[in-house]
């Protein structure tokens, strides 16, 4: 079987698996977030944290809950790393330095999982399981909660109430993420991923000498790392490591986990707003971009540019032979179009245009299908922008799902789409202009610029992957990327919740003959066009200096 055919068959199998899971999971999540009942274990949690799950919150109160919980999480994870040397199960590792502890705490709480450290050489069992893995669950649940709050803004009327943050947080963790992760961990263990609390083993090598291998609760962390679109690896090699991702089936299964919840949330959206066709329109937009980018990536990586590529069956530099070009390309697009950032290959070693696709995938705002929760609210913001543009073209007041998109709403949406590129581009410019950050670049020219741009784009979009030729473990990058991750996560949430509150207060407008039918293919095309044009206008100058220049030169 040719490598190209193998890659296409993997993509077909992945689409089929996602299609089978779409309806049951999407409907289940709609029931979870619409139910008035609380499980017994949830009641214990509410009692322990002193929260009343039945109190409805307006958007400022909901936002305070998000920020307070996240602030406490950052502080807890920072302290846990700083005292690691005194904890049992530390495997002899020292406590983490202040700048790196801040960067890691910000990274995992924001669902970014950017790592400027070697996991198997820095973090013991307690920090990995009691700190990082816990944040993998709750940071993903925070994202879903904010997305659900925005959906309620569309579905509710004449009220500013968006639900209860604490209830949404606990339900997302207990009823959605935990069950999915338990099943996924069992599958990964069956595939060969390790799951233990062993110490460091010294293993003899065929050529003489020895190698140090770490044990750990890898399968359980790998499951939520992918299902929660987190991405932080137990090992430095991330999902290229055989202990995390043993073979071709586990690789395809991990891609399935990455895409599962973000795609299914469009069904949840359709259920909660009372129109499944609205959810299908959003799904069609996501799928169009995802398949288009995947096909383009496979073409760039399979394209033969000389005898070495012909023999290898594509651009194999930086890729695992057990995954091949096809599996690595599908994984790379999935991980950058979502907020995952996990890698099974070395993105810096992709072709110039292939590396540009991973960068552009993040710059779209990770909305196809995007992160767990963040993908849905991101594309709904873009839908508001698209409706507004359509309204300007025909001279009508824009409406979406029966809600008027006025000056106030469009200001919130505009601020949302501006904050992330501003963070990425401003900090990239600062790093290139100042002398000290440049010392971390191992490559010069267009590729070196791409490394810096990729790092800040990854941080601002809460992705976490990297062009790993950059030495990011410095005070400058640990501090600035940490700040970018926090601002890139929580400032957009302010505008999302403010928009949700504004929409929830409105009286629904009945559809008329002139109302734009947002469930039709025409709107899907308009939305895809708006996403690509806005992204292109924002990032094209920077892309021209980096991956485009490198790709054309080669």
UniProtKB/Swiss-Prot annotation:
Family annotation (Pfam families) = KdpA
Q: What is its main location?
A: membrane
UniProt keywords, alphabetically: Cell membrane, Ion transport, Membrane, Potassium, Potassium transport, Transmembrane, Transmembrane helix, Transport
What is this protein for, i.e. what is its function? Part of the high-affinity ATP-driven potassium transport (or Kdp) system, which catalyzes the hydrolysis of ATP coupled with the electrogenic transport of potassium into the cytoplasm. This subunit binds the extracellular potassium ions and delivers the ions to the membrane domain of KdpB through an intramembrane tunnel.
Per the record, the similarity remark reads: Belongs to the KdpA family.
Got a GO cellular component term for this one? plasma membrane
Q: What is this protein called?
A: Potassium-transporting ATPase potassium-binding subunit
Q: How does it sit in the membrane?
A: Multi-pass membrane protein
Spell out where the chain crosses the membrane: 1-21, 60-80, 131-151, 174-194, 246-266, 279-299, 375-395, 412-432, 481-501, 525-545
Q: From the Swiss-Prot or TrEMBL record, what is one GO molecular function term?
A: P-type potassium transmembrane transporter activity
Domain of life, per UniProt, equals Bacteria
Q: Tell me the organism.
A: Streptomyces avermitilis (strain ATCC 31267 / DSM 46492 / JCM 5070 / NBRC 14893 / NCIMB 12804 / NRRL 8165 / MA-4680)
Compartments annotated for it: namely: Cell membrane
Please give the PANTHER family that the UniProt record associates with this protein. Answer: POTASSIUM-TRANSPORTING ATPASE A CHAIN (PTHR30607), POTASSIUM-TRANSPORTING ATPASE POTASSIUM-BINDING SUBUNIT (PTHR30607:SF2)
Subunit structure of this chain's protein: The system is composed of three essential subunits: KdpA, KdpB and KdpC.
